[in-house]
Amino acid sequence: MPGMAASSRIFEHLEWPEGYQVHLLEWDEPRPKEGLLDYAARIAQQITAHNPILIGVSLGGVLMQEVARLLPSYRCVVLISSVASPQELPSWMRRCKKLKLHHILPLARMIRFDFWKHTKRYKKLYIHYIGLSSPTYLAWCARELLDWEGKPLDKDKIIHIHGDKDLVFPIRYIGDCIRVKGGTHIMIVNRFRWFREHFLPIINSKISPTEEPTHTPM
């Protein structure tokens, strides 16, 4: 699952060997009064395999954790540039949550990928990878992220990959994770060579070689 306002094209540089069935997911406009848990239930209905590896970037990682609760046979959840609990949110987000400012202020503008537009190079990336970005959807994302309760999953079934230069979710707030030196919040795109080299070995380290082929929604 891609991050907020991104499309599944962010995964286009990942290479999967035979035995992996990849199912790319996209954000859909949230329904009226639909919360994150109900949204996760809709996404879970799209996943038919009984042993999926769930991969999510940024807010997509938060969503995949909620999807995992609905799919008891999930193999593992892979978080990329994301948070494993509300305690890993930066302090300013936690303060906004405590004061409920996210219900009255346009916080989506502070969380989205606007920094992609700062150079011509990243502006082109922004245009290529942008997905659903309606004002209603962006406001919903900000609200649901800060309202997220985030009950912990089995730590043995979590893989957390995080860049030490992430400005959206700074590394100092992140707990146990695999650190990517120089990795930013968009490292799935601009550090794709690192992922090509390390991503599959990291996943395979969690999976027994005798297990059957893997379905990978992301």
Spans of model-derived segments:
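Active-site catalytic motif of lipid deacylating hydrolases and related acyltransferases
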Residues: 1-50, 96-104, 184
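Hydrophobic, aromatic-rich cap/lid helix
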Residues: 121-155
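Catalytic histidine-centered segment of alpha/beta-hydrolase-like enzymes
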Residues: 34, 183-198, 215
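Flexible "cap/lid" loop of the alpha/beta hydrolase fold
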Residues: 69-106, 154, 212-213
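Gly/Ala-rich beta-loop-alpha elbow adjacent to hydrolase catalytic centers
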Residues: 55-64
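Short glycine-rich catalytic loops that host catalytic nucleophiles or stabilize transition states
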Residues: 25-27, 173, 178-183, 188-192
